[in-house]
Amino acid sequence: MSNAFLRLVGISEKKSYICGIMKKHKIMNDKHLLLGDEAVALGAIHAGLSGVYAYPGTPSTEITEFIQGHPLAAERNIHRQWSTNEKTAMEAALGMSYMGKRAMVCMKHVGMNVAADAFVNSAMTGTNGGLIVVAADDPSMHSSQNEQDSRFYGKFAMIPVFEPSSQQEAYDMMGYAFDYSERHKVPVLMRLVTRMAHSRAVVTTGEVREPNPMSFPSNPGDWVLMPIVARKRNETLIAQQADFLADAENSIYNRYTDGSDHSLGVIACGIAYNYLMEHFKDGCPFPVLKVSQYPLPVALVRRMAASCDTLLVLEDGQPVVEEMIRGVLDNGKTIKGRLTGEVPRTGELTPDNIIAALGLKDEEVYPPSELVVPRPPALCKGCGHRDMYAAVNEVLREYENSRVFSDIGCYTLGFLPPYRAIHSVVDMGASITMAKGAADAGQFPSVAVIGDSTFTHSGMTGLLDAVNENSNITIVISDNLTTGMTGGQDSAGTGRLEQICQGIGVAPEHIRVVVPLPKNMEEMKNIIREEIEYCGVSVIIPRRECIQTARRHSKQKKQ
């Protein structure tokens, strides 16, 4: 492992890995080697967390999993179960905040789209107990459909945003952010990115705070967002903006450091600050404005602009700050960044990007001694989705223009060889509603493929639409009894999918369950063929446990 990599993740060259995350929790100044996700989780526990609500999604999953496995969370009975989707998670956390307790919501960036209704309106109701919404963004789309930037949501909702530059800061910020939320009676957004979430560094922990006692809001009427109340709450939120800005300009997390060379001033947001300083062991020669708390500290930006010839904006994600600065500064100052090409417009920010943007010579890179064998994405050997797709493909060859609308999950890999089985993947739950829309347009056969966890996340409402109109679609709920793609978390509908579908209104005789195995291929094909020919809504449930969780359960039984 190279020294450069060790510096990237925040580990000194000679410092040993420090284990014992689960040691006695009352020790102050203890040290742990933590992922960014784990630093957020431990910081929340130590800050008096009473409940975490989340739906699994890379790169946020490990936050909740860490809390689920931590002894202090069990001792304090911190709520730590998975939610059905991000909207229900957001609303449940808001309910806990209503009762004066500290709550946290965790999701990946696209989960913010699902939670948006509750999220934006939580800024209107305000909070009682501290409420932190953690959004883990995925620049470069390592495991996502897009690289949207959650800072836009913070600005849209007019609430403060925190963006840690290191794992230590991620830990420290949790207590600070909970205090901030309670002081201003407003939810706050904590924005992570993949490299922060999934890299490790040594974190020094602090004092462990007790959870809040239960208490009702002092002004419960503020939580009833009828127009007469909402208008007043909106005025209050707008009035708070000046306070949020003043806090950001005086925040310990926003720091202006002068330099000897004023030909360039660098604004580094979140993890970009870590990347920047990696290249300057003896300090950066240019003035640097570190930004980790929003609203954008305008006074600090203007201070830098007044003394520097050119500004370079470094941020991982969309050019959020770069666009803001162009609006703040109207003096013709040259501003460089993603919008002008010095930093690539797409993809995650890297230390190499920063070297190029600064015009510095990169360190010599030695080629690897061995090439790693390529591991392209593929369904696991023995996966039930394989047998499901094999059967679907064989039946659909009998039709001239079949279309299969798929969803978010392991089964998305059915797009790749050797199956090439699906024609669309857009967002959670879209398979059923897109199949319905295609059928409305005259498409036959119109097939939806969705997983059990995604179905309960956001597929049930689409099924209700289809039932209400008796749409001519066939829905395959490929049930592997878990949330497989994110590591095998519990699925809300396990063991109840038939009852759910029947309760929504699907005719019981057209809810078919089959075990997807090669020996059952003829049975599967016959069922698929029969339900495609049925004129109406039909549901096929190929059910077999995820091969990975099955192996894990088998090992546990042997122990």
Segments (PLM) and residue ranges:
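Short helix-loop-beta junction
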Residues: 68-73, 277-288, 499-507
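Short beta-strand segments
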Residues: 106-107, 132-136, 189-193, 267-268, ...
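Thiamine diphosphate
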Residues: 18-167, 195, 259, 285, 415-539, 547-554, ...
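Flexible, low-complexity linker and terminal segments
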Residues: 12-37, 47, 164-379, 384-385, ...
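Short helix/loop capping segments that flank catalytic or ligand/cofactor-binding pockets
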Residues: 115, 142-144, 198-201, 274-278, ...
